[in-house]
Regions:
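N-terminal anchoring/stem segment of glycosyltransferases
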Residues: 1-61, 82, 134-135
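Generic structural signal for short, flexible, solvent-exposed coil/loop and linker residues
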Residues: 20, 85, 118-120
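Low-complexity, flexible helical/coil segments
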Residues: 39-41, 64, 77, 126-131
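Glycogenin-like
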Residues: 1-8, 97-145
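A short, glycine-/small-residue-rich helix N-cap motif at loop->alpha-helix starts
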Residues: 14, 65-72
Length: 145
């Protein structure tokens, strides 16, 4: 499974624990970190945010939206998905540890839907999310912008 991590500015020190946890639990894990800072971990790919940012993403970054940091994450994840030509990926906050491989959870996720942790009925958080279609992020971006 593809795992995408997003680090807006600097890469937090604790992310190495999260990455090691994923690699030890999910033998099929492919780890990609999206950040402007290079990460030097074995078996981890880095995508430079400024290099993959589309015009839509840059517009969000230059906007006056209150939640532009959270919204930018969604846009960057979509940029990374396209850059890497991924059909699906798992994404969660950098301080989340997982204890099961994706293969043992995949049956609970719905196809062509936003599979994401809900804080409430009105608010979503990236505690754990599974994106299984480019269209899911396109629709979400259209609602946001």
């Amino acid at each position: 499974m593809n795992y995408l991590f997003y680090c807006e500015k600097s890469i937090p020190e604790y992310i190495k624990h999260t990455i090691n946890c994923v690699l030890s639990v999910d033998r099929d894990a492919i780890i990609n970190v999206c950040s402007d800072e290079k990460i030097n971990f074995k078996n981890v790919n880095t995508l430079n945010l400024s290099e993959i940012a589309t015009e839509d993403t840059k517009k969000i970054l230059n906007s006056n939206l209150d939640e532009k940091r959270s919204i930018a994450r969604i846009f960057y994840l979509h940029d990374a998905m396209r850059e890497l030509r991924l059909k699906n990926f798992v994404h969660f906050d950098n301080d989340v540890l997982i204890y099961k491989p994706f293969s043992s959870l995949k049956n609970v996720f719905m196809e062509n839907r936003l599979n994401i942790t809900k804080s409430s009925n009105a608010k979503i958080i990236f505690g754990y999310s599974y994106i299984n279609s480019d269209e899911v992020l396109i629709k979400l971006k259209e609602k946001i912008s």
